[in-house]
From Swiss-Prot:
Cysteine disulfide partners in this protein: none
Cellular component annotations (GO), alphabetically ordered: periplasmic space
Keyword Signal attributed: yes
Transmembrane segments: none
Location of the protein in the cell: Periplasm
GO biological process terms, semicolon-separated: cell division; protein import
Protein's UniProt name: Tol-Pal system protein TolB
Record family assignment: Belongs to the TolB family.
Subunit and interaction comment: The Tol-Pal system is composed of five core proteins: the inner membrane proteins TolA, TolQ and TolR, the periplasmic protein TolB and the outer membrane protein Pal. They form a network linking the inner and outer membranes and the peptidoglycan layer.
């Protein structure tokens, strides 16, 4: 590679005690890529691919992106004058009577076609995933930090009417959405059961008690996991999927339980005569953080995975800290704050690390709820609501950048990715 740029993603902060990911930016510019599309075979579909691919590359923070239509043969001399380094051409090809999405990646500096990537068009509405995979191919060609998270599915529960929520799947931009569980019941709190995203847990309210079910997407089959009076929710899944943390209330007061997916057994691991909920695995699944009212208000605590292990308070700032997620030794949580200048309560996201007292604020206004780490812990998705917008939010921690994807005609109860 003869390009004159460097991706210095790992910074001093990566090794500092607060684990905050800072970025060292070089004086070099980002590689410039021109994203083009062909009007042959299916111009509308190619245009959709083109738009999503360009936005993905912009979102990655790894490229300077421009957009254009196909202009015949690649004029490398003209592109060099424009200081363009790469050209990504998306098109729809027809082979053996079947349409496929195609990406061709040209290296302007060497004047050659470097990559051809085909993605079958199984269903027209799946075009966002074709574009996401294309973005990953382009990104990997430069050996930039991974953006594989872009192709992951979002599973979410959406409100339909009184007492009715359906479970649906989506891509991270929410362009693609498909309902997969529709039964005129309350289906809530979906949580992925494995890294492959072939199964997920969710809570269904039946005629008597809430039940935790495990659903296999490929087989469309259910497995009963647990039930409990009042509350039954899966809040965290271990990295290998062998254990889950559940909030159950068999005796009226909710506690956190550890469930072994192989032995099909559950063990109570909190016993405070109040509220202990929302356990999330920490420290390579050896401990957990959870929300409790032991302080007289919702706050975050930590303990090892045993009933007799003591609980340690993690936060001493704020009077209402809740809705948490964790990745290794990092915790993101929602903090309720004082009324803003418009007289409304603000719910902001904050990030902390176990070995640091530093609190990193991630949002500044509105109601920001349900933070969820990506699989690599470098990004966070959440729901943002203000008087002007309702959207799925994305925070790139390495770059201190955030994006909002409007949620139109859908109200989300809970989600996971």
């Amino acid at each position: 590679m003869k390009y004159l740029w460097l991706f210095l993603i790992y910074a001093i902060g990566l090794f500092a005690t607060d684990k905050t990911l800072d970025i060292i930016k070089t004086i070099q510019k980002l590689p410039k890529i021109e994203v083009r599309y062909s009007i042959d075979n299916d111009a509308n579909y190619a245009l959709k691919l083109h738009e999503v691919l360009a936005n993905d590359l912009k979102t990655s923070q790894h490229f300077d992106v421009s957009q254009n239509k196909e202009q015949g043969a690649i004029n490398y001399a003209e592109l060099k004058d424009k200081k363009v380094h790469l050209v990504a051409l998306v098109s729809v090809a027809v082979e053996n009577g079947n349409k496929i999405s195609r990406l061709k990646l040209y290296d302007v500096d060497t004047g050659t076609l470097k990559k051809t990537f085909d993605y079958p068009i199984v269903s027209l509405d799946l075009y966002p995933f074709a574009a996401h995979n294309m973005a990953i191919v382009v990104n990997d060609y430069l050996k930039a930090p991974s953006i594989a998270w872009m192709k992951r599915l979002i599973v979410f529960s959406k409100y339909i009417g009184p007492g009715i929520t359906n479970i649906a799947l989506a891509d991270y931009t929410m362009r693609y959405q498909k309902e997969i569980i529709k039964n005129n019941r309350l289906n809530i709190f979906p949580k992925w059961a494995n890294a492959e995203q072939t199964e997920f847990y969710y809570t269904q309210y039946g005629e008597k008690t809430p039940m935790i079910l495990k659903y296999n997407i490929q087989k469309a089959t259910h497995e009963n996991i647990a039930s409990s009076q009042g509350m039954a929710v899966v809040s965290s899944v271990s990295s290998d999927g062998s254990k889950i943390l559940m909030s159950l209330a068999p005796d009226g007061q909710p506690d956190v339980y550890l469930y072994d997916t192989h032995k099909k057994t559950k063990t109570k691991i909190t016993r405070y005569p109040g509220i202990d909920v929302s356990g999330v695995f920490l420290e390579d699944d050896k401990s957990m953080a959870f929300v409790s009212d032991r302080s007289g208000y919702p706050n975050i605590y930590m303990k090892k995975l045993g009933l007799k292990e003591s609980a340690e308070q993690l936060l001493y700032e704020g009077r209402s800290n809740e809705s948490i997620d964790a990745y290794k030794d990092s915790i993101v949580y929602v903090s309720r704050e004082n009324l803003n200048e418009f007289g409304k309560t603000v719910f902001n996201l904050n990030l902390i690390a176990l070995n640091s007292k530093y609190i990193r604020r991630l949002t500044v206004n509105g109601s920001n709820q349900m933070p969820r780490f990506s699989m690599d812990g470098r990004n966070i998705m959440y729901i943002k609501k203000t008087s002007q917008e309702y959207a799925m939010g994305l925070i790139l921690l390495d770059y201190n950048q955030s994006f909002l994807f409007p949620l139109k005609n859908v109200k989300i109860q809970a989600f996971d990715w």
